[in-house]
Amino acid sequence: MAVTLAKEALDVGIITNNGEKMLAFYRDVLGLAQEPSIPFPGLGTIHRLVCGNSILRIVAADNAIEQVAGGAFASRNGIRYLTINISNLDEVVADCKAF
């Protein structure tokens, strides 16, 4: 049986040691609207950002997450990239450079 989608979008979670900087980038530079944050005891704070019909969840960890050495694109499983299709690339690149 195939799944019946309840939402025509993907929600993505990113766990980070650098929550404030990452939140500032997606919220202040890319302009994603922020929904109320959710504290998750023992894990960190989940910051929710609206991206079209999708939600980007930035999990700012309470305790430092071990840094794993890099590898080739397909060398391990997990989220390796996130694509946001936009139509104003030049303006966004200028904002990123200013950030």
Each predicted region: which residue ranges?
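Vicinal oxygen chelate
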Residues: T16-E20, N63, A74-F99
